[in-house]
Regions:
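Conserved "landmark" site that anchors the functional core of diverse proteins
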Residues: 1-129
Length: 129
């Protein structure tokens, strides 16, 4: 594993503030550093939601315009269901990460899709009335 138990504990038990240096590429987070002694790694695939840890140890959550490859170690990925919620956060706002399983993430994504479908049907009925 690239990160020890201390890094995981820090990530999930700390508040992080979205930096003013954030944009659609990534949300730079201010808070406790996670300690990246690895520096750069060979380039590997990245995706929106990946949380990479550059040399300073401060997490960056990759967002919609994130590069498709990069060389920083990645500690986690924001659930696809939660990524739109994170995208609505503004610089200066606090966030906190919570570890969930892949199954929990999949259930949340299905709930979101169902909610969107329900809203779409209600809006469609409303426009016909």
């Amino acid at each position: 594993d690239l990160f020890d138990e201390s890094a995981w504990r820090t990530l999930t038990e700390s508040d992080y503030r979205i930096s003013t240096a954030s944009d659609r590429t990534g949300y730079k987070l201010e808070g406790p550093a996670l300690g990246n002694s690895l520096g750069m790694l060979p380039s590997e695939a990245g995706c929106p939601g990946a949380i990479q840890i550059p040399g300073d140890g401060l997490p960056i959550a990759l967002m919609a315009d994130a590069p498709t490859v990069g060389g920083y170690p990645k500690i986690a990925v924001v659930s696809e269901a939660d990524l739109p919620i994170l995208a609505q956060r503004r610089p200066g706002e606090k966030i906190r990460f919570q570890l969930i399983t892949i199954e929990q993430s999949q259930r949340a994504l299905k709930r979101r899709a169902s909610d969107i479908h329900t809203i779409s049907q209600l809006a469609s009925r409303s426009s016909r009335d």
